[in-house]
Amino acid sequence: MKLGAYYKGGDLKKPSGGKKRKVRRTKKKALGGGPPQIPKLGEEDVRIVERVRGGNIKVRLREAKYANVYIPKEKRYVKAKILSIVETPANPDFARRNYMVKGAVIRTEVGKAVITSQPGQDGIINAILIE
């Protein structure tokens, strides 16, 4: 009977008593791109260009001051200044922290609007006027 078979230690030892080593190093793709970078209301538009999986590039929005607001009655877009974030269905805390995500209701110079783009992914804020 082998005593190695009954050894119940940490995961760093093999049944034979030998040390376990890493199979491979931690690769960049396994880290998942880091923590989420949610755009905030700021004094000016701040964008970062980032390399993503496959060698592609993605323009991310860090801070925003303006939004492209679509006015359905007039069938045109207007570049409007964002005054505040009214509510965010994704997370109530986002509105308090001035985070802008898809579906958030923002107050602009032309009225209230709902964000239709993904600012953190697209690098721009598109919205539709609701008032």
Curated annotation (Swiss-Prot):
Residues 1-38 are annotated as: Disordered. GO terms for biological process: translation. Gene3D superfamilies: 2.40.10.310. Belongs to the eukaryotic ribosomal protein eS8 family. Part of the 30S ribosomal subunit. Keywords: Ribonucleoprotein, Ribosomal protein. PROSITE patterns: RIBOSOMAL_S8E. GO terms for molecular function: structural constituent of ribosome. Residues 16-30 have a biased composition (Basic residues). One of its GO terms (cellular component) is ribosome. This is Small ribosomal subunit protein eS8. PANTHER family: 40S RIBOSOMAL PROTEIN S8. It comes from the Archaea. It comes from Pyrobaculum arsenaticum (strain DSM 13514 / JCM 11321 / PZ6). HAMAP family: Ribosomal_eS8. InterPro entries: Ribosomal_eS8 (IPR001047), Ribosomal_eS8_CS (IPR018283), Ribosomal_protein_eS8_arc (IPR020919), Ribosomal_Se8/biogenesis_NSA2 (IPR022309).
